[in-house]
Amino acid sequence: MFKMVSSPHTHSGKLTMRIMLWVILAMLPAMGVQLYYFGFGVLIQAALAISFALCLEGIVTVLRQKPTLFYLSDFSVILTALILAMAIPPYAPYWLILIGTFCAVILGKHVYGGLGQNLFNPAMVGYVVLLISFPLQMTTWLPPIQLLNEPPTLLDAYSLIFTGFSTDGFSLHQFTQSVDAITQATPLDSAKVILKEGVNDNTLLQSPIFEAGFAIGWWQVNLAFLLGGLFLIWKRIIHWQIPVAMLVSFTLLAAITELVASIPYLKTLPHLFSGAMMFGAFFIATDPVTASITPRGKLVFGALVGFLVYIIRFYGNYPDGVAFAVLLGNICVPLIDHYTRPRVSGHRQ
């Protein structure tokens, strides 16, 4: 006896929880590298973000009369919180990650109806709200702890995040007094400011945070994200089209600019391994809910995000641009999918 059911009749077997767990697992090496170079702050930020995100998810599902345990166990809100925690400065004040998590979970996800119905990447919604609202806190980074005379301990990290001072009474700024002043910003921040003042990139690369043309700590973190992303492609958790199209698009434009522009910029390869480039290409832009779903659309979407990152990094006021590029790309997804959907044999589009 056969039972008739509606289509689709096949599925990949990759449940949401399994996919989220694989993505989280692929992020852990990058988190470990960030911990090694930038200290214990990332662990505290992740703990705060995940705890608060789970609380918010639980409250919202209860209010909406949804099965709370079912939604908490899919790990999607944990992934959102982890992405946000790894994107902000490790020693940012505790209230920053709480505000960002609230915006990500409530404004970025549940306002649209929950997982699978959101138009924008939730973590990037939270990040952009923080970047626009609190630019000082969002651009204040400690340099790699290997450059500090006395790196903050775990207790120092906890104290800095919750009080603004270490256990010995030192502020975040005082930890950097032994290092060049520009190291309190990211390498891309520093490049944006210094190059606008007319200083050539060779002078910039003499800063302590650069070694052999690459930003210490940042290229290692990006390399870890790259390896984690390749792992996800190998496991068929994400598709290759979006990250490849994004990186190729940005690389071509940056390389052309490097060759013909009269204004000095960082070289193309350091650009690829600075900021959130690899993080965005493999873990943010590939969000299956907010990215294009057609094969050609994935290429178009990835290329568009790469183009937008290039425009913002080279000509905009923000040094990185990955978050803005992804959100702007999300806006275009319905249009991209409409014009790139496969044609059904025997039918006109």
Swiss-Prot record:
GO terms in the biological process aspect are: electron transport chain; transmembrane transport
Record InterPro entries: NqrB/RnfD, RnfD_bac
Q: What EC numbers are recorded for this enzyme?
A: 7.-.-.-
Give the superkingdom in one word.
Answer: Bacteria
Q: Where in the cell is it found?
A: Cell inner membrane
Subunit details: The complex is composed of six subunits: RnfA, RnfB, RnfC, RnfD, RnfE and RnfG.
Task: Give the protein family.
Answer: Belongs to the NqrB/RnfD family.
TM region positions: 24-44, 77-97, 98-118, 125-145, 214-234, 237-257, 269-289, 299-319, 320-340
Which is a Gene Ontology cellular component entry for this protein? plasma membrane
| Sequence positions bearing FMN phosphoryl threonine | 186
Q: What does this protein do?
A: Part of a membrane-bound complex that couples electron transfer with translocation of ions across the membrane.
Q: What's the cofactor?
A: FMN
A Pfam family the protein falls into? NQR2_RnfD_RnfE
**Membrane topology classification:** Multi-pass membrane protein
Specify the protein name: Ion-translocating oxidoreductase complex subunit D
Organism name: Pasteurella multocida (strain Pm70)
Its keywords, alphabetically, are:
Cell inner membrane, Cell membrane, Electron transport, Flavoprotein, FMN, Membrane, Phosphoprotein, Translocase, Transmembrane, Transmembrane helix, Transport
Which gene specifies this protein's sequence? rnfD
